[in-house]
Amino acid sequence: MATPLLTLANTGVNLGDRWLFRHVDVTVSAGDRLCLVGRNGAGKSTLMKLMAGLGEADEGSLWSAPGISVSYLPQAPKLPRGMSLASVVMHGTGGDGDFIAEAHRAEAMLTRFELDPGMLSDGLSGGEARRVALARALVKEPDVLL
């Protein structure tokens, strides 16, 4: 069995008048591919945000392996306007390394997704915006992509 990277245990989110979900357990290990399925409003996006560390549960716990990186790709990505796509994607690198190397990685990732790194982020189609968001999520080579 692979070593867990993320674990949610007995997790629940309360909306005040009702529980969105309760008693949820999820373990993500290296190489796992998981699919969340449920009706609208069941809490799938909320659960993903919890796993990414972007929210707080009302009960339960989240554990992540020390030093792992997590990228979160939201359902409807919001990209900054008026920037080159390379600059948008470089925001995904975290800016903690060599600027030149990060720029090359951003450009390579955009090229992989058939996008022009010099193109401005204004006026992208929905599909193009989605590909830019995916490039931004993948450029830092995360251990977990949500």
Q: Which ranges hold each PLM region?
A:
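ABC ATP-binding cassette signature C-motif
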Residues: 1-146
